[in-house]
């Protein structure tokens, strides 16, 4: 207790000086360290502010560059989309042309097949597989081939339109995403330290797991562009093919139509010539019938005219049998009368034989007359079928110029055949 109440120890003056000096030094050292820290802090603040400004400026520049890059690709995609849309609309028009062309071949095919059916109604020897039949069948085969080709081309156009729309969908989706990205980056680019809607966000300093690399991003847009380019090229090639098909088929059908019409004209001329020759022969046969009938009449009259002389000769011979006794002489007159009767009998036999031959010839002429009349009727039937039924019906086939390359009158023109 006594120790606790003792007064504190006293120091020597030297100790006092030393203690004060020590305080001075420690204070000076502390102040110096503090000053260095203040200076370092100021330098650090300035450095960080400069770095922050530089980083923010760099980010702004990168955002601006990114915006320009995305906008560039968006414009490229926009242009490609517009081109693809226009090309698809063109292809739709071409498809309509193909469908109308396909439809327009039905009536000519019907006419050709009907001509073939009509010509099956020819009769007799005229039911021949002639050049007209061959060319009509060839025309029908060509039209069938053209229709099959057009049907396949319509299917190709339909598929190409589907592929174009698929590429269009991909472009539109890419454009939509790029528009959203541009909108977001525009907002980000416009932000500054004084913007009212800036804030801290949790867990944003990260790489999204579903994000893609810049190379993947470029590949994606490039792929969409390449797919669109491929469909554009395919569409343009298909349009060129359609133009060629429509032009070539028009020319083929026009040429074949001309061949068929020429065959009809030539065949009709040949049939008419045959009919006219038959008519000439019929007229000659008719004249010969009249001549033969007159000849028969002359022969019959000649036979009749021999009856008088025959009766006279017979009467003379009979009367001379009544000569008496030696007067019943075989004189010259008697022999001449006998010879006269024999001559008349022989002449009548000759006349009757000639008459029989004339009657046979007349019957043959009548048969020939009937055959010629029937054959002329066969020719008339053929002429009626070819000229009245077929050739008149073929006039309803619309003409085709063969130079259709897609320019339709009034925007859309029905396709013709020949």
UniProtKB/Swiss-Prot annotation:
Keywords: Cell projection, Cilium, Coiled coil, Cytoplasm, Cytoskeleton, Flagellum, Microtubule, Ubl conjugation
Coiled coil residues, start to end: 20-107, 134-177, 266-308, 332-383
Subcellular location: Cytoplasm, Cytoskeleton, Cilium axoneme; Cytoplasm, Cytoskeleton, Flagellum axoneme
GO biological processes: cilium assembly; cilium movement involved in cell motility; flagellated sperm motility
GO cellular component: axonemal A tubule inner sheath; axonemal microtubule; microtubule cytoskeleton; sperm flagellum
Pfam families, per database record: Tektin (PF03148)
PTM: Ubiquitinated, leading to its degradation. Deubiquitinated by USP16, promoting its stability.
Main localization category: cytoplasm
Tissue expr: Predominantly expressed in testis.
Family membership: Belongs to the tektin family.
Task of the protein: Microtubule inner protein (MIP) part of the dynein-decorated doublet microtubules (DMTs) in cilia and flagellar axoneme. Forms filamentous polymers in the walls of ciliary and flagellar microtubules.
Name this protein carries in UniProt: Tektin-1
């Amino acid at each position: 207790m006594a120790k606790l109440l003792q007064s504190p120890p006293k120091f020597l003056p030297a100790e006092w000086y030393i203690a004060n000096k020590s305080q001075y030094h420690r204070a000076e050292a502390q102040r110096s360290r503090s000053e260095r820290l203040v200076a370092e802090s100021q330098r650090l603040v300035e450095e960080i502010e400069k770095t922050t400004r530089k980083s923010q400026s760099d980010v702004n520049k990168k955002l601006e560059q990114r915006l320009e890059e995305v906008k560039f690709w968006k414009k490229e995609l926009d242009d490609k989309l517009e081109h693809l849309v226009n090309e698809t609309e063109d292809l739709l028009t071409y498809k309509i042309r193909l469908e109308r062309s396909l439809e327009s071949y039905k009536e000519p095919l019907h006419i050709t097949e009907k001509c073939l059916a009509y010509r099956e109604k020819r009769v007799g020897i005229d039911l021949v597989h002639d050049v007209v039949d061959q060319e009509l069948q060839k025309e029908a085969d060509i039209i069938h081939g053209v229709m099959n080709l057009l049907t396949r081309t319509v299917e190709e156009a339909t598929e190409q339109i589907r592929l174009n729309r698929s590429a269009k969908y991909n472009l539109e989706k890419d454009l939509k995403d790029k528009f959203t990205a541009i909108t977001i980056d525009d907002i980000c680019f416009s932000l500054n330290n004084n913007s009212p809607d800036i804030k801290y966000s949790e867990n944003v300093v990260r790489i999204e797991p579903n994000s893609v690399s810049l190379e993947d991003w470029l590949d994606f847009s490039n792929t969409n562009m390449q797919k669109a380019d491929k469909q554009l090229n395919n569409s343009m090639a298909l349009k060129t093919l359609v133009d060629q098909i429509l032009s070539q088929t028009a020319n083929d059908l026009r040429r074949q139509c001309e061949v068929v019409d020429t065959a009809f004209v030539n065949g009709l001329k040949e049939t008419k010539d045959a009919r006219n020759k038959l008519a000439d022969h019929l007229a000659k046969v008719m004249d010969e019938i009249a001549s033969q009938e007159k000849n028969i009449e002359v022969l019959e009259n000649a036979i009749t005219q021999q009856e008088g002389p025959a009766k006279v000769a017979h009467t003379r011979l009979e009367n001379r049998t009544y000569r008496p006794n030696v007067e019943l002489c075989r004189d010259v007159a008697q022999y001449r009368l006998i010879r006269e009767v024999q001559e008349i009998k022989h002449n009548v036999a000759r006349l009757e034989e000639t008459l029989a031959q004339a009657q046979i010839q007349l019957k043959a002429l009548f048969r020939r007359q009937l055959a010629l009349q029937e054959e002329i009727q066969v020719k008339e039937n053929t002429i009626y079928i070819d000229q009245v039924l077929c050739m008149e019906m073929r006039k309803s086939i619309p003409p085709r110029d063969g130079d259709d390359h897609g320019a339709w009158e009034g925007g859309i023109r029905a396709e013709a055949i020949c």
